[in-house]
């Protein structure tokens, strides 16, 4: 396997280091050392030394959620996410992806989303149709909201309607490239999706990115890949926080006590932590989880639930337990995928709300 020298250096530095193994949300959920960044690096180093074949470690490579908790915690600056994504790309180029990943990749290429979905729910179709006219601002919902959580996509639209914002929602959204980037890294196919989306976004003055996964991709990864977006790109939370600040979205604080679950894409990658809190504090009394802001613990997602659903359910259950342990009974999310993961856990001790639920009083 022909990894970059940078990746090899990081792999050899991580393979015998235990300092972040307690950070990994997947490792904590499985209880297996093999799920951690250290074990992943050890496996890659064995492939590099031709001791084992690349195909033998690929299940482990796809256990990484790329949340960057290990990277954030590393005092010496090593980056397991970087070498994990590079190995995924190499596996794709060498035709050594697991079958379950190949299926998701094929879906992305065929339908624009990893789930292979082509039809929207009737409610979402109607909500989109009401905003089909071209304006200066486009609300980009993303694949998870459109195909897996359409009820949340409708709520995201309703929030902007409540503020009397003039905006467009596309019936046929281009793929942002976020899912392909997760699955196969910086492949040509990933970049083509990104370039296509950037071209569509360029037809508007402002692009509001609902899903933090898409926000990270468009605002951070596009720059790394040399892709320019001519429009101004903003996260949904920063946009809504601005509406509240400008008095366009009326807020009534219910006094309900809640904790906020920071999406790592916002808090660690985009360094956006206060805007969602401004929204929450306008509608409720905000308390904090023990690990918050850049120290946040990932709570699961929809894409990985396609191939390791039991593990993702345990990841979400552990985050709910974090709230329960400090006697908090409501978690508010700003990521549709984390919301879905948390809501999927069968329990009755902690209520799961999205920011849209909080604003709309639902």
Where would I find each of the regions flagged by the language model?
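Short cysteine clusters
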Residues: 14-20, 24, 64-70, 74, ...
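Ferredoxin-type iron-sulfur electron-transfer modules and their immediate structural context
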Residues: 1-61
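Conserved beta-strand elements of the Class I
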Residues: 138-139, 259, 331-332
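C-terminal amphipathic alpha-helical segment
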Residues: 235-283
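Short, conserved active-site entrance elements at the starts or edges of catalytic domains
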Residues: 139, 230-239
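Cofactor-cradling patches in redox/metallo enzymes
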Residues: 144-232, 267-362
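Iron-sulfur-cluster electron-transfer modules
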Residues: 41-222, 226
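Iron-sulfur (Fe-S) cluster-binding segments and ferredoxin-like electron-carrier domains
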Residues: 22-47, 76-93, 305-316, 322-323, ...
